[in-house]
Amino acid sequence: MFIKFKISNRPIAPHLLVYTPQLSSLFSIWHRISGVGLAFFFTTFLIFIRIILSSNFACNLLTLISFEISQWIIIYFNLFILLFLFYHLFNGTRHIIWDFGFLLDIKYLSKFSLFLLVSLSLILIFQ
């Protein structure tokens, strides 16, 4: 079998650069990335809360306030987390709908992708 591929001068497995990325595959990859990002954020947040509650609260609160985090950093961080959360929620809903076998036609795929992008844009605008 290996000789057959060697004779035809074809690669055994096609390279990723051969394919053009499809919107549904990009959204699936971004869904996984947003899930990892949310898991990292919530785990870090819970560990941070646990540390604050397990030790001297007033001392830790004064230390936290003394960091003097800029208001813009807090706003962008909240926006980033909100965007990840809603993207993961909307795209997860889409994956659940697909698991039930609905909206698998190409026209529905592109319409739902457009709906996802528009809804995330509206969240960014009205946040």
From Swiss-Prot:
Cofactor: how bound: The heme is bound between the two transmembrane subunits.
PROSITE patterns: SDH_CYT_1, SDH_CYT_2
Keywords attached to this entry: Electron transport, Heme, Iron, Membrane, Metal-binding, Mitochondrion, Mitochondrion inner membrane, Transmembrane, Transmembrane helix, Transport, Tricarboxylic acid cycle
Primary subcellular site in the record, as a coarse category: mitochondrion
Pathway: Carbohydrate metabolism; tricarboxylic acid cycle
Annotated GO biological process: mitochondrial electron transport, succinate to ubiquinone; tricarboxylic acid cycle
Organism in which the protein naturally occurs: Chondrus crispus
Residues noted as binding heme in the record, renumbered to the chain: 88
Subcellular location: Mitochondrion inner membrane
Statement: the UniProt record of this protein carries the keyword Secreted: no
Keyword Magnesium appears in the UniProt entry: no
Gene: SDH3
The protein, known as: Succinate dehydrogenase cytochrome b560 subunit
InterPro entries given in the database record: SQR/QFR_C/D, Succ_DH_cyt_bsu_CS, Succ_DH_cytb556, SuccDH_FuR_B_TM-su
Subunit structure: Forms part of complex II containing four subunits: a 70 kDa flavoprotein (FP), a 27 kDa iron-sulfur protein (IP), a cytochrome B and a membrane-anchoring protein.
Protein function: Membrane-anchoring subunit of succinate dehydrogenase (SDH) that is involved in complex II of the mitochondrial electron transport chain and is responsible for transferring electrons from succinate to ubiquinone (coenzyme Q).
GO cellular component, one term: mitochondrial inner membrane
Cofactors: heme
Family: Belongs to the cytochrome b560 family.
A GO molecular function held by the record: metal ion binding
TM helices/strands, residue ranges: 36-53, 60-83, 109-126
UniProt topology in membrane: Multi-pass membrane protein
PANTHER family xrefs: SUCCINATE DEHYDROGENASE CYTOCHROME B560 SUBUNIT (PTHR10978), SUCCINATE DEHYDROGENASE CYTOCHROME B560 SUBUNIT, MITOCHONDRIAL (PTHR10978:SF5)
Superkingdom, taxonomy of origin: Eukaryota
